């Protein structure tokens, strides 16, 4: 039987309707946590909730469009109201629009900036009050290897992920004395629906061909990395975790 290392801990996972978020919600539940799940697609959340219930997660389903900063803050308040507190916030919601700068759709890029960065900041801000007051809490921000290496056609996406990495480090230095831990996770290529967002046909075809040429990470691989971070003893903080497929160079 899996050790319940997160028994009596309360977690909120955004972008939980698929991919890394879905796998993370299940991993946290298997480790004993109570789990709130947030995303736009209610049907997917309801399906996930049915799988979480047998694990004892007592799931709270939060349908929300996190492009709205008030919704990003409200899901935190709703989690705290429902369970009494929030111990672990996993900011996973995001999109990936890849295209050359000269052909960029700035409206699409603005949406990506708002979801990948500003929404994450809004949820984090909402969670800090309770965590600092209790001197206990963990913020996990999902960035990307694109937050370390900026490649052609990924200018805006990389900018958002570099932003998440920088925000996470600055936040860590603001809250470490309150015993609030901050971890930023930087996955390489993962087999998720994220590439479906790419609107530039040639770039999308190239990325998909590249993905087929190697053994991609699975969402469960990233969820396991997140679980590792949030199950360390209180005196240990994993500030940054970079993971790539073995076959991925850049």
Give the predicted meaning of each segment.
Residues 33-48:
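Conserved glycine-rich Rossmann-like NAD(P)H-binding loop of the short-chain dehydrogenase/reductase
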Residues 43, 63-74, 106:
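The beta1-alpha1 cofactor-binding region of Rossmann-like NAD(H)/NADP(H)-dependent oxidoreductases
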Residues 144:
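Residue(s) in the substrate-gating loop at a strand-loop-helix junction
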Residues 124, 160:
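Active-site helix of classical SDR
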